Amino acid sequence: MSNGNIWVTDSLRMRSWTSWNPEIIVEAENSMYHASYSRVAGDPERVYVTPGTQNPEIAGRVSNNAYLEVQPVSMSANPGIVFYLPNVRSTTYSVYIVMVPATIVSTSYKAKPNCMSFTMGMANEKGKNVEVSKEWTVENNFTNDTTKVDTLYLGDVTFPMAYAGTGDYYPYLRVTSYVTSRMRDFQDRVMRIDCIILRPKELDDFLKEHPDYKYDDGTYN
């Protein structure tokens, strides 16, 4: 080179999540990433929450001061929504979803937990579209804590192909209410979703070992 030197190294003096493999945060209220709905009353609604309007008895904060409310088309219906997942790299992610309780701005509601199932859709090593659910989730169904803005760990998933820079071709996450008729008096079919987090597993492991580490370089969508 005419203007510098080149060295060969087997180690990069940086953490991958601060450069080529960032955390991805998909704000659920961003309609750009709504692929489809099922058994939903109208379009899901963006609901705003600020620190001033939030119920002080609910722990945690709603990211971006807004969440998505998904209403069932009837009292007996379990609604579902599919989210596109942008900028996914070929790596292993720890997947989280952040849920908001009904009492986030009011104490007049009786907060009931959601029960949900999740399915991830992606392309495999041969480029064929596949769906995975039980293979990558910790449990088949998940419930949230109604005393806080609750972050649920769904499990780890490995993407064999990268999608960043490929235009409108995305993997997706299907979120479906899973409340049986027997449980409808105790569980809520209305889903209030704050965001979806795809955290590189390397970062997830690091945060568990270093809980005071501050990381603010996630990619927000």
Residue ranges and their predicted role:
Residues M1, W7-V8:
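Extended non-catalytic domains of envelope/secretory-pathway proteins
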